[in-house]
Amino acid sequence: MNEDLPKEYFELIRKALNEKEAEKAPLSRRRRVRRKNQPLPDAKKKFKTGLNELPRESVVTVNLDSSDDGVVTVPTDDSVEEIQSSEEDYDSEEFEDVTDGNEVAGVEDISVEIKPSSKRNSDARRTSRNVCSNEERKRRKYFHMLYLVCLMVHGFIRNEWINSKRLSRKLSNLVPEKVFELLHPQKDEELPLRSTRKLLDGLKKCMELWQKHWKITKKYDNVGLYMRTWKEIEMSANNKRKFKTLKRSDFLRAVSKGHGDPDISVQGFVAMLRACNVNARLIMSCQPPDFTNMKIDTSLNGNNAYKDMVKYPIFWCEVWDKFSKKWITVDPVNLKTIEQVRLHSKLAPKGVACCERNMLRYVIAYDRKYGCRDVTRRYAQWMNSKVRKRRITKDDFGEKWFRKVITALHHRKRTKIDDYEDQYFFQRDESEGIPDSVQDLKNHPYYVLEQDIKQTQIVKPGCKECGYLKVHGKVGKVLKVYAKRDIADLKSARQWYMNGRILKTGSRCKKVIKRTVGRPKGEAEEEDERLYSFEDTELYIPPLASASGEITKNTFGNIEVFAPTMIPGNCCLVENPVAIKAARFLGVEFAPAVTSFKFERGSTVKPVLSGIVVAKWLREAIETAIDGIEFIQEDDNRKEHLLGALESWNTLLLKLRIRSKLNSTYGKIAEEEPNVTKEQNIADNHDNTETFMGGGFLPGIANHEARPYSEPSEPEDSLDYVSVDKAEESATDDDVGEDYSDFMKELEMSEESD
């Protein structure tokens, strides 16, 4: 090595070599320090016991619920002290000796068991377990609809009962002449409010008279018509006790005598007003179970008292004021109040305890002419933002269904009173205003947040926001609110064509969006798609058919009919599966009609040909040909079914012939009779419930006792209910063949006659 190098270089090289050797050397463990009083173990004794005994397994339990992080307890037989690390340990000269490979045999097996924390996810598990499944949600929704129909029909029946003429004659005697005059005041031309005031005084007098006449002698059975929880409904389904139904005669007797529960009392009060020729209608607040409650455990608290439940009524009354053109609300039993509802009604339930059993969602009105109307808008202050979300009418399917139910129960023509009431409901919708929370603005029928405007929507030109919403908890954050009438829907040119409209000449797109093209993964690409508004389109008018009936077709040889306006003016659409076959049979001009598209797996799209487009003067001929083709198809199906039945009969007769021949030639094989006790009991049970007519290949006798089939004891093969005389018993194989040939001849003759 060069001696000219300074000493510092040699020291650096020596230090680097020492560090490499230290890295290659095996790591040594620190010596375990034992207690002073504990004697050293005998090496020989330990070696002997190690050969005779298997190593014991040590268990290490790690509990994640423990608050001491990083501390693990290892229970072993040897007591070992844990030495805290300090600077003195590094200065100590005592090191642990490296164990040889032969000493590894004494090492014990250690199994580590980790227990997950149960407290950490306990709350999350409770919430996840208390949410019902999708199937349960559907079941609750349809049960809610069924329950609602039953309640509405119940109110309709009670409204029919209180129109009894016999009951009206009895109740009219309760009202004196002075009160009757107050119920029918003359119109005050100077101040119509005076006439309304007299009507209100007459209603107040009627309430006082009815309170003297009626005595509430009975409480509600369980919860009555108030809302039940899902758990209570399941328990009542398992309960098989019979409920006593109230008959019409019992109802009329209770109203005449003035004894019963509060619901019958209100219904009797409406009957008394109708007996006085007052336009009064029965109001019912239907309380079906809440289908928006997604919890599995829907049990209520035990603190719910009977007084909280009956604080707000289920039934009340409305009287028409012909002077102010409004309905007056009357509650003669519970709250004993008379009001003209403006924004908030006194009959709307308030408080958590009252709303658990009485939730204002469906308020149905029944008038004296058997009319049925939904008047929930009058009593619900926040109808569109809060109440609507708990109704079945929150989506289009439920809205259509509810209208059908109302229409089925509405048995009168429309009057001017309905027009006044609809105008009042429209004013209430306008005066409800913008909700004060983001949650209430979700799916609102009249307002939408700026952040909820869809990609295919824009704000109409010249329209601005109608209000602002300040977000709670976020300083300075304000959201814009737009009216839905100021939002325009945009569609592409193809989408407008599917609706029977095409773009105007020179129209410009209102918006350009990115559309994903290509269904398979990895092949999706984005391309620009131009969107147009309704004002940029016009109605598509197809060309007319020629005098010979020829129709203009596209390149595929058909015509697209996605809307009724896409049919040529002198043509018609005939939708039938065999319409194309009928037109080809007649040899007339036609065009297959593509009315929709069918999407299959992947990106495959196939057109649906549901009929044809022909000239109007050929419609009758096409329909006649379709009827003939359908008749031929039905006749072919009938013949095919008949041939199948005849083949089955033929197979049965062949089997009987072969069996009879084998028995007559080789004799009958003895078989054990089956155990008929169990089958006889089953047949008796079926015979007790209903009787069956004979069917199948072998005709039976009506009301005949069912018996299991058993082999006859005679050498000949016969059936129990078929009488066989002695002449037939001596029949030979030739006789059987002649009978079969005669049967086949008759069969061929019947086919020729057909």
From Swiss-Prot:
Residues 27-37 have a biased composition (Basic residues). Its main location: cytoplasm. Residues 730-741 have a biased composition (Acidic residues). SMART domains: BHD_1, BHD_2, BHD_3. Residues 250-269 bind DNA. The keyword Nucleotidyltransferase does not apply. GO terms for cellular component: cytoplasm; cytosol; nucleotide-excision repair factor 2 complex; nucleus; XPC complex. GO terms for biological process: DNA topological change; mismatch repair; negative regulation of transcription by RNA polymerase II; nucleotide-excision repair; nucleotide-excision repair, DNA damage recognition; proteasome-mediated ubiquitin-dependent protein catabolic process. GO terms for molecular function: damaged DNA binding; single-strand break-containing DNA binding; single-stranded DNA binding. NCBIfam families: rad4 (TIGR00605). Belongs to the XPC family. Present with 876 molecules/cell in log phase SD medium. This is DNA repair protein RAD4.
